[in-house]
Regions:
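...captures the hydrophobic TM-helix bundle architecture rather than a specific catalytic motif
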Residues: 1-286
Length: 286
């Protein structure tokens, strides 16, 4: 919400918008390109990049429409409440996504592995050991090394925890009316997120080139890249949201009492922090 809320009409009905449908189409193209890319299809990288560019363009115009409506004084307290509920349900849906992925990991480790290690399978594959990270029966998967918690995952954990602190400081500065401090701490939060993604990319290069850990490395490889990759996507989206918020802070769009765009992005970022803590423990330590 912006500083213009005091001018809001009693009731405002947003007009039709093409952006939700365009966002869905763009994300579909992105996922088609990504899925084909990991399967070695030659044209896949171009489709994936096209989809990403389309997503960015859609977000640019969609955010622009919302900002213009807010700055025009069209948003009332009821609209503000609807945004809060919408963001809450959106984050809840993301929680369900990660719950499904964590559930997959739990099933594979706690149910499937003991089943694979029972007496029947020992008779069929006498050299098979039912331990998490095992490559499976001989010849089914290339040998690889599992990813440990040091040093990159631990560094990334410290980076995200620190970013949560800097974002909280920025929010307190916003509520106190200190715009410069708000912008500085918010910029540091975005910078920490960018450094996190840089280390994540380096970790993937290390996994592929030195550990031979790939998406095709059995259930371990698929769950590892699914969980960490999906989380990395959320960090990227959170950094984009915070960048838009930083732009609006510098433009003076917010007041100490009306700044839900800031709060919504902060909710999302803290959610990303909490998910990473779960990943750090379950994926890298256990």
């Amino acid at each position: 919400m912006s500083s213009q809320q005091a001018k809001a009409p009693h009731y405002f009905v947003p007009g039709p918008s093409r952006w939700p449908m365009m966002a869905g189409i763009s994300m579909l193209i992105t996922m088609i390109g990504a899925s084909a890319w990991v399967n070695g299809v030659s044209w896949a990288p171009y489709v994936n990049i096209l989809g990403i560019l389309m997503v960015l363009v859609v977000l640019y115009y969609w955010f622009g429409d919302a900002i213009r409506e807010s700055e025009s004084g069209l948003y009332s307290e009821r609209i503000d409440l609807s945004y809060r509920w919408s963001m809450s349900w959106f984050i809840f849906s993301e929680v369900m996504f990660f719950a499904a992925f964590f559930g997959t990991l739990f099933y594979a480790r706690s149910i499937t592995m003991p089943w694979l290690a029972d007496l029947d399978h020992k008779l069929i594959w006498p050299d098979f050991s039912g331990q998490w990270g095992n490559v499976g029966p001989a010849g089914t998967v290339e040998n690889f090394t599992t990813m440990g918690p040091f040093p990159i995952p631990t560094i990334n954990t410290l980076l995200l925890l620190t970013s949560g602190v800097t974002l909280t400081i920025s929010h307190h500065a916003m509520r106190a009316g200190h715009r410069t401090q708000t912008a500085v701490w918010l910029f540091l939060t975005i910078l920490l997120g960018a450094v996190f993604m840089g280390f994540q990319a380096y970790e993937y290069i290390h996994a592929y080139s030195e550990l031979n850990l790939k998406l095709s490395s059995g259930i371990y490889g698929s769950t590892f890249f699914m969980l960490t990759g999906f989380h990395g996507f959320h960090v990227t989206m959170g950094a984009i949201m915070l960048s838009v918020v930083l732009y609006r802070v510098l433009r003076g769009h917010f007041t100490p009492t009306h700044h839900f765009a800031f709060e919504g992005a902060a909710w999302y970022w803290h959610f990303v922090d909490v998910v990473w803590l779960g990943l750090y423990v379950v994926v890298y330590w256990l």
